[in-house]
């Protein structure tokens, strides 16, 4: 814990803010007697930093980048399914993370809780459309999944989707 005047800020939280400033995500970080203040670099950064779901995506992104076995790691990739026949109707999907392992594409969806059947179907579609048998998808869920009783686990396994739950994340 650090004190600046009468304010006490958890050292871990303040170090995160200092890191965010160093990374130019925020600026004018200031701790006074009554408050800690800063400015976000832009609206997009603010929305990312205030959205709990983005933290799981960032956690996965950072770990994929650190691993160095994977390349072309990307976050929030949008797919546009438009063709000349459907000019008036825009059809898009977004996948949380994509990367390559060698020449094989991988697709990851990050969820705070067990997803809907529609979300699983969407995730299962990417490998067959973009890489066939050489492509894989994974679902990362913050909560722990009971593998014996979970519809999500059973359905994901049947669809060829690797499931990584909170218990596996904690193990590393």
Located regions from the model:
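Intrinsically disordered, low-complexity Ser/Thr/Pro/Gly-rich regulatory segments
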Residues: 1-172
